Each structure stands twice: as C-alpha cells, then as structure tokens.
Amino acid sequence: MDRQCAVASLTAFQFQIDRQCSQTRGRACSFHTPHGIVETPRFMPVGTLATVKTVTPAQLRDTGAQMVLSNTYHLHLQPGEEIVAKAGGLHRFMNWSGPMLTDSGGFQVFSLSELRKIEERGVTFRSPRDGAVIEFTPERSIRIQNALGADVIMAFDECPPYPAERKDVEAAVARTYRWLERCINAHERPQDQALFGIVQGGVYLDLRQQAARDLVQLDLPGYAIGGVSVGEPSEEIHRIVEATAPLLPAHKPRYLMGVGTYREMVQAIAAGIDLFDCVIPTRLARHGAALVKGDRWNLKNAQFREDFQPLDEDCNCYCCQNFSRAYLNHLIRSREILGYTLLSIHNITELVRFTTRIREAILSDRFVEEFGHWLQPSAVPVSP
C-alpha cells in the first residue's frame, strides 16, 4: 500500500501512509501539522514543563526530534496557561518551531491517588505545590490546551491504576467516553489543534476493544492507547496493543502513550502504532545511564574511568562526537549538570534514531529482517 493518502477533516492536518510493511501491520507515515511534518514511526521526547530536562531547544533539534510533548497539568500549575498564551503559545514560549503535543493532565491528576476525588463533573485535587484545591474537568483541560496552543491535544480521560478491579475499569472506560464527548464540545480550535481520543480499559482486552470501537465512531483526527506503563508487565502492554491497534482507523495517527523501550516500540510498530513518548532518555541520563545499541550502560561504573573511547563510536550526536566515556564517568561521579545534559542528548538521539531506522526499514520492506529479533520473547526491555 504505497503512498496511500488520507486527509483528515481538518484542513491543517493530513495523514499519509508512505509504505505498509508486507509482513506486519507496521507502516511508515507522514503526519502533516501546522508546525511541520512528523515522519513516523517516531519517538517524541517529553518536555513536561515546556522544556526537555537539561537540554536546550537547539540541542533538541540536533537530536533529530520532530515532535515534543508537554503537560497540561504541570503547565497549569506553573507558570499558568495565561502566561503561555500571552507569550504567543507554547511554541514561542519555549522557542520550539516544530510540532507539539500536550497531554490532558489526566494521568498526572489520577496519580495523586490520596489527594483527589473523582466525580462525573471532573476531578478535584489538592495541588502538590501549595495544597490549594483545584478542579480539572474535560472542559477546563481543553480550555487550557487551547490556550497553550499545541498542534495535537489530548482528551481528558480517567486512567485506572494497575492492578484494578474490572468494575472500576468498566466505570473508568464509560466515564472516559462521556468526558471525550464533552471535550469535543468544548474544543474551540479544531482547525489548528487536532484532538485525539484515548482508549482505556486496563488489562481487560474486551473493554479495550469495545472502547476502541466506541471512540472510532466519533471520527476524531487521531487516537491514542493510554493507561499502559502504569506498573503492568511488558507482556501485558504487548497484548493490549495487539488487541487494540487494529481497531483504530488505518488512515489516522495511532499513538501509544508513555512507552519508549526498544522492544515495546518494535512490538507496537509491528501492530500498527505510529507515535511514542517516554521520559526514559532523560530519566536514565539523570541517573548516569546511557542507551547504547539496545543496551543500558551505567557510566558511574569504574570500568569507564580510563576508557577514552566515544560513548558510541557509531553515533553522530554532540556527546559522542566530542567526549569520551572517561569524561562522562567523571562528570556523573562529580554530579556535574553537563553530564546529565550530554547523556540526555545522546539518549534522545538514540531513541529518535532507532525509530528513524525502523521507518527506513519499513520503506525498504526490511522491517522484520532488520528488527525481528526485538519481536522475540528473549528480547529484554530496557527499564527506566
């Protein structure tokens, strides 16, 4: 299926299938947004507070990143969406000219299990900053995201924990659908902000599948699979994606939220997923760890103290082109911020390059040949 083109109902957005893998449901696509094209499959770095931790926008561009994620909940608390709007929106505020996506804040709100109360209207919680009572509703989440101005915005959903009773997950799925309808009605910028719906359902595959079928009827510009990477085994994520992704429209972007390990991304891409985000690259960097050719290295280890080779001699990132493993070992042991910056640059480059290589393999129909080993049970994911 070469160059299949499907244009979303929004004039500023277009999603094009460039090549379909002949052996899996994987595909290479081009997602056109108001701020540029996202070539998928694609890993998106996380810039929660309008910054990818320890990395400048210029450095981020050099990693090959095309789309960046920020968070509605955190930006509402600091500095506030009004400030961002006065600056001209997120892109100008953080000096990022490429596409952006904002999460709805639902995941963060629901992670405050002891501080929040769920009702049909929305969620009330106490701010972890000052204890003030804050209410998040579908309408408020969308208003905040409209003010922030990202290219893609996410519906406010209820993310059940893991593990959770089936009845509780059923209630969360039903409420997520009702809240999505309210998000659609509240959305004031559909021409330049694409609203994605989120499929919930925990580890209950029948609930996931029914949720997907229901959301598809709303004909949104894109769809996400949420509520994963919340403590469940990697095998469960694979089961969820395998059961859910095929039910989402082939002519629209599919986004797997919060996933960014090598194996989990390859498995999801084989199932038809296009977009990923995860804090893994910067979180590992802050712990002195580097992602190198599918493995995880602890740069604090003594073995690197007199190792003057580049971190990865095959990597063209700023870190690997200019500094040795010994220097990185010194920086991390000294707790110098530069060490975290250099490892963040490398780790982001590594995951962006990994998904870029997968795209190239799909375009040449060599995906299974080049990445099939990650589909095997023996392939161990690199945990954050």
UniProtKB/Swiss-Prot annotation:
Cofactor: Zn(2+)
Cofactor note: Binds 1 zinc ion per subunit.
Binding site for Zn(2+): 315, 317, 320, 346
GO biological process terms on file: queuosine biosynthetic process; tRNA wobble guanine modification; tRNA-guanine transglycosylation
Listed SUPFAM superfamilies: tRNA-guanine transglycosylase
Active site: 103 (proton acceptor), 277 (nucleophile)
InterPro entries listed in its UniProt record: ArchSynthase1/Queuine_TRR (IPR050076), TGT (IPR004803), TGT-like_sf (IPR036511), tRNA_ribo_trans-like (IPR002616)
Metabolic or biological pathway: tRNA modification; tRNA-queuosine biosynthesis
Superkingdom in the source lineage: Bacteria
Listed GO MF terms: metal ion binding; tRNA-guanosine(34) queuine transglycosylase activity
Binding residue positions for substrate: 103-107, 157, 200, 227
Pfam families on file: TGT
GO cellular component terms given for this protein: cytosol
Keywords: Glycosyltransferase, Metal-binding, Queuosine biosynthesis, Transferase, tRNA processing, Zinc
Catalysed reactions, semicolon-separated: 7-aminomethyl-7-carbaguanine + guanosine(34) in tRNA = 7-aminomethyl-7-carbaguanosine(34) in tRNA + guanine
Annotated segments matching region RNA binding: 258-264, 282-286
NCBIfam families for the chain: Q_tRNA_tgt (TIGR00430), tgt_general (TIGR00449)
Physiological role: Catalyzes the base-exchange of a guanine (G) residue with the queuine precursor 7-aminomethyl-7-deazaguanine (PreQ1) at position 34 (anticodon wobble position) in tRNAs with GU(N) anticodons (tRNA-Asp, -Asn, -His and -Tyr). Catalysis occurs through a double-displacement mechanism. The nucleophile active site attacks the C1' of nucleotide 34 to detach the guanine base from the RNA, forming a covalent enzyme-RNA intermediate. The proton acceptor active site deprotonates the incoming PreQ1, allowing a nucleophilic attack on the C1' of the ribose to form the product.
Summary of subunit composition and partner proteins: Homodimer. Within each dimer, one monomer is responsible for RNA recognition and catalysis, while the other monomer binds to the replacement base PreQ1.
Similarity field: Belongs to the queuine tRNA-ribosyltransferase family.
Descriptive protein name: Queuine tRNA-ribosyltransferase
